[in-house]
């Protein structure tokens, strides 16, 4: 047992209150305090400083010991209280565990005794030894109670509810199957329509390829409607996406920029129109114009018409692009480029080749209704249409030329030709027209000289042979030979003076590869007699010169004739 110390406050009475009759020494007066001190100390004769110091130290030690004793007693009291609480809780826990074990054992024994009549072996393994000793294993049994009529009604209602739920589920499943069948049938119809349209495009001899739809990256089929496989090197390859409509299964035509970086592009359809303006009464008036003539409704299928329409306008765009390339080389020969128009000026005639935006709603523009103003406005319509057809044919020839270069064995020469070749489309047209004009000018020069020296000559004869380079060809010549070879024409002038001397003048008009430059080669041979001229013997070569201007050759020929006569 821990020893407990009890301290009694002397100032407290038996009820725990301070006694009012006890005097507080701190509040006593001096005359009351001195007698009490004398009574306690009795005598001050033997009081010294050391004795007082010892007394004070002893009093301090006593107070410290009292404080320590008080703290120890408090700690012991707290520990005793905690131990008591722990023991109490431990006892309650043990009691609860025992109660739980007893109740569990009783429940187990009850269940074991209940099933002992059905499963004896299982009951023996689980029943407690005490119960098996005092109670017979099969003494406890159970019976099933009979059901009331309400239970039968409830079971019937339950069966009815079950059948209703089954019927409802069956109806929902039937609707789902019917909806799935309808959707599947619609999908089959859409797929059949889609592949039928793809087959129509393929049957139209179109080239198809696989690609991704740039809108949703889904698999799709594209079509090549351009002329890349025919020899075209135009930057627009003519590619389009055949996009499927998920609602109907039909396909629609959408041009794209390229295969690798496919983007849907909105193209502006343009076509080429040729106009001729002639000088009438000092003013240039429209005397001819080509007609836009293309049937976009040849097929019953809109997708085929869209492809043909895109192919037509792509060809027109490529043609005008090649014409612009050539026109830049002919700027010094009265050929100018203004916006989307090429202007050619030749001998009081202006030929305009213009790229016009196609507007299917503007029928007056397409059919030239406004052109029939006077008798001259349609004078050269056929000529304009022939010029346009010629330009298109020459572009096809250029395609064929490029295709042959691609089929040849790749060498440095063929690669150079592929990258540096320019089409012969506009230059042959302008060159041959200028050549015809040069022939007229040359003939007028010779006629003027013959007329000027007519009195001094006894005989003169002029023969003109046009395009002698084509005349030497066989009958199976290339119909485009005139457009791919530079023109060569010949003037043969024979003069005879009063003394029967003969002067044979041969003039050849040609050009270079540009088809527009003027090259004149003149050869003059003098014969003493007419027989020498006929036999082509004893001829004296007087002149053999080349010219590029009619004034120069006129002066030179005039001087030669004056010396001859």
Swiss-Prot record:
UniProt keyword list: Activator, Nucleus, Transcription, Transcription regulation
Alphabetical list of Pfam families matching this protein: Med17 (PF10156)
Organism whose genome encodes this protein: Candida albicans (strain SC5314 / ATCC MYA-2876)
Region ranges (Disordered): 138-160
Biased segments, Polar residues type: 138-152
Compartment(s) where it occurs, according to its Swiss-Prot or TrEMBL record: Nucleus
GO biological process, one term: regulation of transcription by RNA polymerase II
Family: Belongs to the Mediator complex subunit 17 family.
Protein task: Component of the Mediator complex, a coactivator involved in the regulated transcription of nearly all RNA polymerase II-dependent genes. Mediator functions as a bridge to convey information from gene-specific regulatory proteins to the basal RNA polymerase II transcription machinery. Mediator is recruited to promoters by direct interactions with regulatory proteins and serves as a scaffold for the assembly of a functional preinitiation complex with RNA polymerase II and the general transcription factors.
Keyword Transcription: yes
Molecular-function annotations in GO: transcription coregulator activity
Subunit text: Component of the Mediator complex.
Predominant cellular place of this UniProt entry's protein: nucleus
Protein name: Mediator of RNA polymerase II transcription subunit 17
Cellular-component GO terms for this entry: core mediator complex; mediator complex
């Amino acid at each position: 047992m821990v020893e407990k110390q009890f301290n009694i406050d002397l100032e407290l009475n038996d009820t725990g209150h301070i006694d009012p009759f006890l005097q507080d020494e701190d509040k006593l007066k001096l005359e009351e305090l001195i007698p009490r001190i004398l009574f306690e100390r009795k005598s001050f004769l033997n009081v010294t400083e050391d004795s007082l110091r010892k007394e004070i130290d002893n009093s301090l030690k006593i107070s410290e010991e009292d404080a320590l004793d008080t703290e120890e007693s408090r700690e012991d009291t707290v520990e005793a209280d905690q131990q008591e609480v722990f023991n109490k809780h431990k006892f309650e826990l043990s009691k609860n565990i025992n109660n739980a074990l007893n109740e569990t054992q009783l429940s187990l024994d009850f269940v074991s005794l209940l099933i002992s009549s059905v499963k004896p072996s299982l009951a023996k393994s689980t029943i407690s030894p005490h119960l098996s000793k005092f109670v017979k294993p099969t003494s406890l049994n159970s019976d099933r109670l009979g059901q009331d009529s309400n239970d039968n009604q409830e079971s019937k209602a339950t069966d009815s509810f079950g059948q209703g739920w089954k019927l409802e589920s069956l109806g929902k499943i039937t609707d789902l199957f019917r909806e799935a069948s309808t959707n599947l049938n619609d999908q089959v119809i859409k797929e059949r329509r889609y592949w039928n349209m793809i087959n129509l495009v393929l049957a139209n001899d179109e080239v198809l390829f696989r690609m991704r739809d740039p809108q949703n990256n889904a698999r799709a089929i594209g079509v090549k409607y351009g002329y890349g496989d025919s020899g075209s090197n135009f930057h627009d390859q003519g590619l389009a996406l055949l996009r499927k409509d998920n609602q109907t299964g039909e396909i629609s035509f959408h041009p794209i920029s390229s295969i690798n970086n496919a983007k849907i592009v909105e193209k502006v359809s343009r076509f080429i129109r040729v106009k001729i303006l002639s000088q009438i009464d000092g003013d240039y008036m429209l005397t001819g114009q080509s007609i836009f003539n293309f049937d976009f409704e040849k097929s019953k299928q809109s997708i085929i018409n869209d492809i043909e329409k895109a192919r037509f306008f792509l060809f027109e765009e490529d043609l005008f692009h090649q014409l612009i390339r050539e026109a830049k080389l002919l700027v010094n020969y009265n050929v100018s480029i203004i916006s989307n128009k090429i202007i050619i000026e030749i001998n009081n005639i202006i030929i305009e080749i213009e790229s016009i935006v196609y507007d299917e709603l503007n029928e007056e523009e397409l059919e030239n209704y406004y052109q029939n103003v006077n008798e001259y406005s349609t004078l050269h319509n056929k000529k304009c249409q022939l010029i346009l057809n010629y330009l298109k044919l020459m572009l096809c020839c250029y395609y064929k030329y490029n295709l042959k270069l691609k089929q040849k064995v790749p060498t440095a020469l063929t690669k150079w030709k592929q990258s540096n070749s320019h089409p012969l489309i506009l230059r042959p047209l302008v060159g041959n027209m200028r050549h015809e004009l040069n022939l007229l000018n040359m003939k007028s020069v010779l006629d003027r000289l013959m007329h000027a020296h007519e009195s001094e000559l006894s005989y003169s004869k002029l023969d003109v042979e046009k395009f002698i380079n084509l005349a030497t060809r066989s009958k199976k010549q290339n119909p485009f030979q005139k457009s791919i070879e530079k023109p060569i024409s010949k003037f043969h002038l024979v003069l005879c003076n009063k003394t029967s001397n003969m002067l044979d003048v041969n003039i050849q008009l040609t050009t270079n590869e540009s088809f527009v430059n003027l090259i004149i080669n003149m050869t003059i041979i003098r014969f003493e007699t007419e027989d020498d001229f006929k036999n082509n013997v004893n001829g004296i070569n007087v002149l053999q010169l080349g010219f590029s201007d009619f004034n120069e050759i006129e002066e030179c020929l005039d001087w030669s004739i004056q010396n001859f006569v």
